[in-house]
Amino acid sequence: MGRAMHDFDILVVGGGHAGVEAACAAARMGVRTALVSFDPARIGAMSCNPAIGGLGKGHLVREVDAFDGVIARAADAAAIHYRMLNRSKGSAVWGPRVQADRKLFHAAVQAIVATQENLTVVPGEVAALRFEGARVTGIELADGTALSGQAVILCTGTFLGGKLYRGEEIMVGGRIGEDSASRLAEQMYGLELPMARLKTGTPPRLDGRTIDWAALEEQPSDGEDWTLSALTPARSNPEIFCGITRTNARAHDIIRANLNRSPLFSGAIDAQGPRYCPSIEDKIHRFGDRDGHQVFLEPEGLDTHLVYPNGISTSLPVDVQLGMLRAMDGLFHVELVEPGYAVEYDHIEPRALTSGLRLKDVEGLYCAGQINGTTGYEEAAAQGLIAGLNAACVVLDREAPALDRATSYMAVMVDDLTLHGVSEPYRMLTARAEYRLRLRANNATARLTPLAIELGCVGGERAEWFARREEKRARLDAALDSQASAKQMQDLGLPVKSDSGKMALREWLRFPTIDFPDLAPLVPEVDTGTELAAELAEDAAYAPYLARQDAELRELKANEAITLAADFPFAEVPGLSSEMVERLTAARPETLAAAGRVPGVTPAALAAVLVHTRKRGRAAA
């Protein structure tokens, strides 16, 4: 390795979803970036389920895409099954989800990484972080190679101190067949960083040729034309169906009879697993009254017989896994290709991080993905993007992107993590966002791409596409300002009262019985059937509700503008109880708005902090 490979601006450790987004985001910003991976050939591999998106998660994917990220483009290149979840509810909580061909997804990520300017892939195990005082200055590889950088982003996934469990078997590793980052984990514990352990798991992989598909309920792809990335012109792959079966009393009996052989119940694993993706043994133990649990049989690709049984993550012994599977309809003769297993791993206490995902007490050290206590590809990708952008802004001496709970699900997630911490793997849900009417999956581009362009992390193709989109948006906006009378509505066959008067088309769209395409004869100069037209129509429909939030948002913005120093002396605030001092000192919120979201902090305490910040400001002036 020549000296040119030794010196970088940013070093990203780990080639999973967080690492890829962090490295590519930093490189798009123009800084020299190294992506360090155990095995570069595995960069972009899907460790668990072959799917991208879902409830809350689809919002994150679209937001990462708005910054010209990788995950949505790769998912579209690999998509073989599409579902828009929550379609029966309002569009604010719709969840776009695609099932991906693993090989195609991996190939798409590899191609994007290989062609990304300013990005160098470095093979090797990171053995240690290098420091000067309290600042990280680089990393050392297991072979002794030293790489220097102004920032290091740890995206270690489940590899940091990873252990794999299957029945009585215990193996060292972060993923089956791959080693764990044990030396780096030892160093981080030695640095007395706030660390803990969490657990996740994966189901067995099945041989699809041994499944009786005719005995299963079919779940077809949705047949529409939406995609995850705004830059994807159309769906490109054949679409397949998934099968649905259920666990049953016989399968439950097999599981119950062998709970003592599960590491979750034998005491081998004491780390907490994900609440919203429990193992099948956990489901049977906690929900013993249920007569069955759905299992979605998802083909892993177009040219493979592997099938992913979504819903039965397990670490039971192999013989028990096979027995419970063969008790289910359609699986009486199924064969296992790879048994399921659980993985326990180290993570950072996320309250030790800033809103830019930098460790508060270590300059230049960032963390993203499962190392921060989250679960899921989409959560990891979003954190990788945020860490990469913030680290690049420090290198370039630019202001970091201003994201808050009213502008993105990404900021909701980071705010939840850094203020509340985790006691179990965190996953994104639409219910976590109090401003979700503003944060629809289909308006991520409008919300975030202008900021992305301002930051300089958007490529030429997306910038040109966005400029054309804005021209179309302006024409649609002008059309929505057109006036129409109740009689004109009735002439179109729309059920409105004669005394409704004359209104702008955007106001007529607030009527639940009127859709934008219904108004096409009134505005022939625009296409009312596009995704962009639907987005603007939804903006119009939600406008009265959003207006009611405006005062609340103004207060949020004002409080976000009041910053609190990392060493803010809460103990010196007059009238602040010892409990409030303890809570605020532990959380170390960066703004007054963040202080208000610390659990247990009262409005009175917040007012006292505000008064004290103003006094400090006057004294310093």
From Swiss-Prot:
Keywords: Cytoplasm, FAD, Flavoprotein, NAD, tRNA processing. It comes from the Bacteria. FAD binds at G14, G15, G16, H17, A18, G19. It is found in: Cytoplasm. It holds the Pfam family GIDA. One of its GO terms (biological process) is tRNA methylation. GO terms for cellular component: cytosol. InterPro entries: FAD/NAD-bd_sf (IPR036188), GIDA_C_N (IPR049312), MnmG (IPR004416), MnmG-rel (IPR002218), MnmG-rel_CS (IPR020595), MnmG_C (IPR026904), MnmG_C_subdom (IPR047001), MnmG_C_subdom_sf (IPR044920). The keyword Flavoprotein applies. One of its GO terms (molecular function) is flavin adenine dinucleotide binding. Its cofactor is FAD. NAD(+) binds at residues 273-287. NAD-binding protein involved in the addition of a carboxymethylaminomethyl (cmnm) group at the wobble position (U34) of certain tRNAs, forming tRNA-cmnm(5)s(2)U34. Belongs to the MnmG family. Homodimer. Heterotetramer of two MnmE and two MnmG subunits. This is tRNA uridine 5-carboxymethylaminomethyl modification enzyme MnmG.
